[in-house]
């Protein structure tokens, strides 16, 4: 399940039990991406706060646009865990006539994306693969696609969150599977 010791739900007490209750799934299970933080409940809380701020708080970017960034970054980083979770979440957010976009983007196919969406995924790609190569012209390209500076900030925040989450998952060995709740659902808090 992980490369380091984790504390399972039934052995959690105090701060950790409260964090598991707060951030766990409706069935009482806790996703492995969170359980890898179990030795440091403050780290789990910080991860969740960053996730909620980046992905669920009000933003001029839609939730689907932010999930597209997450799917793109996770695919580029080779993080199957986050790729599967967030492609499922994206699929739930898209209207019926665009549901296929989630699986296409998961495979790296951006043909179903709008110009605006492609500008977001292009920015996320460059920020993931070559962060020091991002220049004013990249920002100008996003502006020409109709994005304003707040949207660009939120795109950078979403891409940066996934860079962090992917490294936690990959670096600590969180795996999809046993103990996982339903994927792609929103947090309770």
Give the residues covered by each predicted segment.
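Hydrophobic alpha-helical segments
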Residues: 1-189
């Amino acid at each position: 399940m992980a490369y380091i010791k984790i504390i399972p739900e039934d052995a959690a007490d105090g701060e950790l039990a409260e964090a598991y209750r707060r951030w766990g799934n409706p069935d009482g299970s806790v996703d492995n991406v969170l359980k890898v933080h179990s030795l440091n409940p403050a780290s789990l809380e910080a991860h969740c706060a960053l996730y909620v701020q980046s992905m669920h708080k009000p933003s001029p970017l839609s939730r689907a646009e932010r999930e597209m960034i997450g799917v793109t970054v996770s695919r580029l980083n080779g993080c199957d865990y986050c790729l599967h979770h967030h492609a499922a979440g994206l699929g739930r957010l898209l209207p019926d006539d665009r549901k296929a976009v989630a699986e296409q983007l998961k495979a790296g196919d951006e043909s179903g994306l709008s110009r605006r969406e492609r500008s977001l995924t292009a920015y996320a790609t460059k920020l993931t693969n070559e962060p020091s190569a991002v220049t004013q012209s990249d920002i100008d390209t996003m502006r020409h696609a109709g994005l304003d500076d707040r949207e660009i900030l939120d795109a950078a925040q979403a891409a940066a969150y996934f860079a962090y989450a992917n490294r936690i998952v990959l670096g600590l060995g969180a795996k999809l599977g046993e103990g996982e709740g339903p994927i792609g659902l929103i947090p309770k808090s």
